[in-house]
Amino acid sequence: MSFPSDSVGLVTPQKFQFEEPLHLECGRVLPRFELMVETYGTLNADYSNAILICHALSGHHHAAGYHHDDDKKAGWWDACIGPGKAIDTNKFFVVALNNIGGCNGSTGPTSPNPENENRPYGPDFPLVTVRDWVKTQALLSDHLGIQSWYAVIGGSLGGMQALQWSVDYPDRLKNCVIIASAPKLSAQNIAFNEVARQSILSDPDFYHGRYLEHDSYPKRGLILARMVGHITYLSEEAMKQKFGRDLKSGKFMYGFDVEFQVESYLRYQGEQFSRNFDANTYLIMTKALDYFDPSREYEQSLTKAMAQTQCRFLVVSFTTDWRFAPERSQEIVDALITNHKPVTYLDVDAEQGHDSFLFPIPLYVKTLRAFLGGEAHLKSTPQVEIN
């Protein structure tokens, strides 16, 4: 198969092992952990062109390119990562990873627990926070020899990680890009997450999180959780244009099977998601969202938290995003302006809702490209090999 000229093409994930104990915010300790990572582009001689991509709730390390010749879908942010794209792999060395607690190769609930005869962690996997993720990402940076990132970029939950980076490691990034995110969850967002969790926890096949030991899987609960979540990712206008009140068969069937096209879509999305995602991971990810609040250690003041930062910021929101509305991004911008920090803010008129950050919307992509600029360039020799 021939790939598009602006694609990074075939990519091979790498697994990095960390043997030192990892102390987590919850008080638990992981004796060791692994991170699944993909890289695109070439690291230059002075390690100055590295960009870290932080993923959202259902994301992972496969952000761009293809794993196999016959893959029909590219990585989740392929629209923005590649030769000549906004995150230009001709200029930048891009690193994407699957966070701990995930289910795509990094240590998580499906991984063997060395303290329990290598049975899957399941519900025994500790709850992790955004700060824990950023800590592991910093350890990955050390392993790669990258003392300072040219940029740390993320959308949604990924944007929260980028924000945490700027507070916890202010001297280790030059630019921070926070997209469709928030400085902490609202009560409504926590409520959405709780409904999703309860749909999983109440599934008879959940077995208190030990479904793998029972050769079972809480598929119904995970499908429902994804359906609830997916509604919040779309705008009303997008749903109106895509589905309206269109009927699947053209007429009312007067029953409880699928009748409206939007019902069919939600069931399909839930079904597809349930085939590829772990239920315990979903619980962990939503709790990490709930716990996120960088102001917590700064007298509940986001302004005081952002006073620690030293980098440039790009903050992007989308007009129809009601999960993380533009006002939430403006809270971050206001805190930065109060501290006289360099920040560019863009509110993009887009109809796709919260998921807008995944689409190559022209103004959004153009702004991201311009912000990253051309300051970093590859040195001809030597090139750095990552092991």
From Swiss-Prot:
InterPro entries: AB_hydrolase_1, AB_hydrolase_fold, HAT_MetX-like. Belongs to the AB hydrolase superfamily. MetX family. Transfers a succinyl group from succinyl-CoA to L-homoserine, forming succinyl-L-homoserine. Requires MetW for activity. It catalyses: L-homoserine + succinyl-CoA = O-succinyl-L-homoserine + CoA. It is found in: Cytoplasm. This is Homoserine O-succinyltransferase. Homodimer. The gene is metXS. The record marks R323 as: Important for acyl-CoA specificity. Pathway: Amino-acid biosynthesis; L-methionine biosynthesis via de novo pathway; O-succinyl-L-homoserine from L-homoserine: step 1/1. It comes from Acinetobacter baylyi (strain ATCC 33305 / BD413 / ADP1). NCBIfam families: homoserO_Ac_trn, PRK00175.1. The active site is at S156 (nucleophile), D321, H354. GO terms for cellular component: cytoplasm. GO terms for molecular function: homoserine O-acetyltransferase activity; homoserine O-succinyltransferase activity. GO terms for biological process: homoserine metabolic process; methionine biosynthetic process. Its EC number is 2.3.1.46. Changing R323L: Can no longer use succinyl-CoA as acyl donor, but can use acetyl-CoA.
